[in-house]
Amino acid sequence: MAKKNTYSYQPKADEKIAKAAGHSLKISPKHSVEICRTIRNMYLEDAKAFLEDVIAKKTVVPFKRHNKKVGHRSDLKGWPSGRYPVKAAAAILKVLENAEANAENEELDVENLKLVHVCANRGVIIRGWTPRAFGRASPSNTPTTHIQIVLGEA
């Protein structure tokens, strides 16, 4: 029996929502947490524009938790440190577009959608080994991330 996909967001009884999830995406969990914190409670079009600007390296994502040895950005207002996590932003944008398609299928008003729930959780670690000199090997592990997005009408 397959495990049922559970969301950490529990909607109200009369709330119309659309959900989408990405499982075991090969992106950084730390970058994903920072992006999700930034786009939470944004309108759908604003979040898509923000992620496209991050991919084009026009907008900086503020790093508020995982910010050790992260450089300061002059174009970032209100917070000193930030980065351009392009790979994570592209993966989250795909999940966001999937949620938008699900909202259209649920006949929600796409112009008035808001991100009511966005979260990133650590997924499984894909173990790997890199051969080294003298018969040794060093671990080269790939972290994965689970993304959950829930859209609701504002």
Swiss-Prot record:
<dbReference type="InterPro" id="IPR001063">
    <property type="entry name" value="Ribosomal_uL22"/>
</dbReference>
<comment type="function">
    <text>This protein binds specifically to 23S rRNA. It makes multiple contacts with different domains of the 23S rRNA in the assembled 50S subunit and ribosome.</text>
</comment>
<dbReference type="InterPro" id="IPR018260">
    <property type="entry name" value="Ribosomal_uL22_CS"/>
</dbReference>
<keyword id="KW-0689">Ribosomal protein</keyword>
<keyword id="KW-0699">rRNA-binding</keyword>
<comment type="function">
    <text>The globular domain of the protein is located near the polypeptide exit tunnel on the outside of the subunit, while an extended beta-hairpin is found that lines the wall of the exit tunnel in the center of the 70S ribosome.</text>
</comment>
<keyword id="KW-0687">Ribonucleoprotein</keyword>
<dbReference type="InterPro" id="IPR036394">
    <property type="entry name" value="Ribosomal_uL22_sf"/>
</dbReference>
<comment type="similarity">
    <text>Belongs to the universal ribosomal protein uL22 family.</text>
</comment>
<dbReference type="Pfam" id="PF00237">
    <property type="entry name" value="Ribosomal_L22"/>
</dbReference>
<comment type="subunit">
    <text>Part of the 50S ribosomal subunit.</text>
</comment>
<protein>
    <recommendedName>
        <fullName>Large ribosomal subunit protein uL22</fullName>
    </recommendedName>
</protein>
<keyword id="KW-0694">RNA-binding</keyword>
<dbReference type="GO" id="GO:0019843">
    <property type="term" value="F:rRNA binding"/>
</dbReference>
<dbReference type="GO" id="GO:0002181">
    <property type="term" value="P:cytoplasmic translation"/>
</dbReference>
<dbReference type="InterPro" id="IPR005721">
    <property type="entry name" value="Ribosomal_uL22_euk/arc"/>
</dbReference>
<dbReference type="GO" id="GO:0003735">
    <property type="term" value="F:structural constituent of ribosome"/>
</dbReference>
<dbReference type="GO" id="GO:0022625">
    <property type="term" value="C:cytosolic large ribosomal subunit"/>
</dbReference>
